[in-house]
Amino acid sequence: MKVKSILKHSRMSSPSLETDSMESGQQQNMVSSTPSIDMNESDCSGTGTPSEERIRRLRWDEENLSKAEQQKSAKMKITEPKTPFQRFLLPDDEVPEINLDETDSKDDFTAGTLGDTLGTLPSTRVSKDSKDDNVSFSSDKKQFYVKKEPFPVPCTEPTTSGDRYTVRMKAPTPKYSTDNHLPSKKELFPRETKPQVEVVHARINNPDDHLRTHPSVNNLGKDSDHADKMYNEGVILGEDEAMEEEALSEAEENIPKKKPDFNELRKKHYFAMAKPLKRDELESSGTESDLERDNSDSGSASDVNMNENE
């Protein structure tokens, strides 16, 4: 009883609370009524229910995602086709039979079907006429073969064939090519290293070999002083060295001849240019002398006439 009386007393005493409660209730009714109005407006617009709109948007997103994935995959994929693999199997009749037993001869193995199917392998033999390994020099008088080696191979004993042998000098290999260049004496015979004599066998077909097997001063070249010096020092040259010395001596003899030839040509050219000048000078001097003679003759004639008149 006391509680009710308190409530009644509170209601009677506070009319403002009732008005506040009424206003709050009206606001709740307005808020609850607003979505219903929006829904009705959306229905009236004709776009459809919100569930259908959401479904339509989801489909649109899915389509965009699928297109983006297709573009990415197209850029990342390799467009080159793969190499086709064709598996080829021989029939049983054409399969070669390989015997693992040892064969007595090579002809038995190559005569079978395996040799026919595989065919002959390319020959890997190197021809003897190859220019890289051996260099052959052929002429009417001599034929011998020279191998490319850094230094000549020394022989312990002199090898003879038919009482014929050649003596070659042991010297460092020259750094020049004998095709387009004539070596000098300094290149052939350096002062630092003393050449040593060494016997090397060579195959020579020359009827005049007895002149070369026993070298003399006359066979070493035209330069007698150089030949005497080499002969006294005990240096014996073979055929190649003698030929090189002869070529050097000929080249040295031809070098000083070029200067007088040039001087002679220059003198001839000078005299050829000077002759017409001399002729002009002589002619001019001749005309002057003729004029002087004419004047002197005319003067003498006038003197004679004057004397006669007197």
Swiss-Prot record:
Name of the featured protein = Uncharacterized protein C17A5.09c
List the source organism.
Answer: Schizosaccharomyces pombe (strain 972 / ATCC 24843) (Fission yeast)
Biased segments, Acidic residues type: 91-105, 242-253
Bias (Basic and acidic residues) occurs at 51-80, 126-150, 182-195, 254-265
Keywords from UniProt, A to Z, are:
Phosphoprotein
Ranges for the region named Disordered are 1-227, 242-310
The disulfides recorded in the entry are none
The UniProt regions of compositional bias labelled Polar residues, in chain numbering, are 12-50, 297-310
**Basic residues compositional bias, start-end:** 1-11
Per the record, residues carrying Phosphoserine are: S285
Q: Which GO terms describe its cellular component?
A: cytosol; nucleus
Q: Which GO terms describe its molecular function?
A: protein phosphatase inhibitor activity
State any GO BP term from the record: regulation of signal transduction
Q: Where is the composition biased (Low complexity)?
A: 110-121
